[in-house]
Amino acid sequence: MAENGQNCDQRRVAMNKEQYNGNFTDPSSVNEKKRRDREERQNIVLWRQPLITLQYFSLETLVILKEWTSKLWHRQSIVVSFLLLLAVLTATYYVEGAHQQYVQRIEKQFLLYAYWIGLGILSSVGLGTGLHTFLLYLGPHIASVTLAAYECNSVNFPEPPYPDQIICPDEEGTEGTISLWSIISKVRIEACMWGIGTAIGELPPYFMARAARLSGAEPDDEEYQEFEEMLEHAETAQDFASRAKLAVQNLVQKVGFFGILACASIPNPLFDLAGITCGHFLVPFWTFFGATLIGKAIIKMHIQKLFVIVAFSKHIVEQMVAFIGAVPGIGPSLQKPFQEYLEAQRQKLHHRSEMGTPQGENWLSWMFEKLVVVMVCYFILSIINSMAQSYAKRIQQRLDPKEKTK
C-alpha cells in the first residue's frame, strides 16, 4: 500500500509540473487563488445572487443530463438489458394469475425497503447538507411504535394499515407484557434498512478519494482538497476541530477495519472524513464498506433505536409531562398541549379519533409538520446552491488556462 501511495504521489507531482508548463509556481500563491475561488463560489447562493444561482443550476443540470446521456449511449447493451428486464417485470405485474399474491407481497416488501434505504442515502449524501431523515422520519416512527406498544400492550398492529397508520389490535395484551426487546424487534427492519442506506451514502467520498489518488489528478471535491490541506498542516494544527479530524484520520489509517467500525458505530459528524481517508490511503473496498455497513446498520442503529425507545417509554413520557407542568408560572399552559396531543394519539390507537376530543389541530403536531417542511425546503435549496457552485467551478477551471497564458 505504501509503494502504491508513493507512485501516486510521484504521478501527481509530474502532473502538477505539466499543469504549470514547467514553471515552478509559488505554492502559497496557488493556495491563495484556490481560497479566493472558493470564497467566490460560496457567494453564489439563492439569497445573495438568485438569478445567477438559478441560471448556473439550470446549466449544471443540463451538463449532468448530457454526461449521463453520453454514458448511457456508450453502454447500450446494459440499457437494452435493463429495458428488457423492466418489460418482463411490468408484464408479470399486470398479467392476472395465481402469481399475483406473490407479486403483491414482493411489491410491499420492496417499497418498504426502498423507502427506508432511500431516506438513509439522503441522510448521508445531502449534496452539501444532509436531510436529517432520522430526526424527521425514522425517529418519529420508532417513537410512535413505542407509544402505541405501551398503550395497546401489544406490537401486533393490524396490517394494513400498519406501517402507514398504527391502531391497536382488537385483542389487546395485558398490562406489563411489553418488553424493550419486543419493540426493538418490531422496528428492526425499518432501522436496519435506514442504516444500510446511510452506509451506501458514504461510498461517494471513498470512490472520489480513491480515484483521485490512483490517477494523481486534482479532484473537484472541496472536502478532499481540505483533507489534503489538513494533511499538509497536520503538525501545526491547533484548533479543536482540526485535531478531531486528525484523530479520526489517524484512527482509520492505523487501526484499519476496527478503526472504521468504531467511527461508523458512534454517531459523529466526521465520518465523511473517514471515507475520504480510506479512499486516499487505498483501503480495500470490502474492508471499508464491510466495517461501515456493520457499524451503521447494526451497532449504531441499535444505539439510536434504544435511545428513542427508552426516551418515549410510557413512564418516561409521563414523568416529562409532569415535569413540564411543575415549571413555575407557565407550567400548566405548556403542559396542556402535550396532554392533548398524547390523549389524541391514544384515541386514534383505539379507533376513537372521531369522538371524545375536538378535531382541531394540536399546535405541537402543527409545529412538527412545519419543521419538516422547512427542513425539506432547506435541503432542496442546498442542492440548488451546490449545483450552481459546481457550475461556477467549471467556469473557473475553464478560465485558469487562459489566465496562465497571459
Curated annotation (Swiss-Prot):
**Could you list which ranges are Cytoplasmic topological domains?**
2-43, 99-109, 272-273, 328-363
Ordered alphabetically, the record's keywords are: Acetylation, Autophagy, Cell adhesion, Cell membrane, Endoplasmic reticulum, Lipid transport, Membrane, Transmembrane, Transmembrane helix, Transport, Vacuole
Name the segments for region: VTT domain.
173-316
Chain ranges passing through the membrane: 44-63, 78-98, 110-130, 251-271, 274-294, 307-327, 364-384
Q: Name one GO biological process term.
A: lipoprotein transport
**Catalyzed chemical reaction(s):** a 1,2-diacyl-sn-glycero-3-phospho-L-serine(in) = a 1,2-diacyl-sn-glycero-3-phospho-L-serine(out); cholesterol(in) = cholesterol(out); a 1,2-diacyl-sn-glycero-3-phosphocholine(in) = a 1,2-diacyl-sn-glycero-3-phosphocholine(out); a 1,2-diacyl-sn-glycero-3-phosphoethanolamine(in) = a 1,2-diacyl-sn-glycero-3-phosphoethanolamine(out)
Family (UniProt): Belongs to the VMP1 family.
Q: What is known of its domains?
A: The VTT domain was previously called the SNARE-assoc domain. As there is no evidence that this domain associates with SNARE proteins, it was renamed as VMP1, TMEM41, and TVP38 (VTT) domain.
**Protein's name according to its UniProt entry:** Vacuole membrane protein 1
**What organism, scientifically named, is this protein from?**
Bos taurus
* Gene name per UniProt: VMP1
